[in-house]
Amino acid sequence: MSWKRILVHIKSYRDYTPAIDAAIQIAKPLGAHVTGLYTMRELAMLKLMFGPDHKATLEAAARDQPLTEKAERAFRARCEAAGIVGDWDVAEGNASELLSLAGRCHDLIVVQQSAQGLDDLGTDIAEECAVTSGVPTLIVPNATKSQSFPKRVVVAWNHSRQSAAALRGAMPIVERAERVTVLVGEKRDLTSSVTKAPRHDIAELLNAHATNVEIVPFDPSTGGDGSRLLEAAHRANADLLVMGAYGRSAWREFLLGGATRQVMKNLDIPVLMGH
């Protein structure tokens, strides 16, 4: 399987954002099409509060139009320079909801790490996309200066549905990686009805898809799961971390602080999440 349609979130009119660069660098070797989705929340709120023809709404639309056009020109220029097909779309509303909706008609969603972690509604856009879209979501750190197609991949594997979804979603990268390191954590408890489990060695799957696969036992018991995942990724000199989003319920993880939130908070390499 190969990605053919990649969706990237555009939330700024600046010429460069790491998410755009990451989407383009992944699209090039795959021959993929990139859609830039520019989201506008303030205008949506004004339309809902006052209506589309109210003075405040019309003034906001007039202010936004040149910024939107500038963002489109910059995006199309980046795609043209890279020799890939780029498409443009503008939507109004909550960014995570818009991205999830459009993302389901794409193979991959690429979003940038939220500047302060949260949007104006107290929601992490990247985290919401990873959990609610049903589509593999690549989250790119704000501090990233340049991007290239990932060559050294670390996969966090704990035999869960979430880690399986993330791994399968990342296969187009895993299959092309020069090295894949798998951090194998604690196995999930089986139900009481299982008296003899089937063979379930993740190395068998990865050796069928990738070359140079290394299996490394991973024990997070001595510290935070997320922090130790990032430390292990750095030791492997990884340029991509693949992991499941949420190993517990969202509410429980919000209260206790789990691997997902720890990684999101301290993100300094791109991470591909699946739920």
Feature locations, PLM:
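Structural beta-alpha unit
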Residues: 1, 76-109, 208-241, 247-250, ...
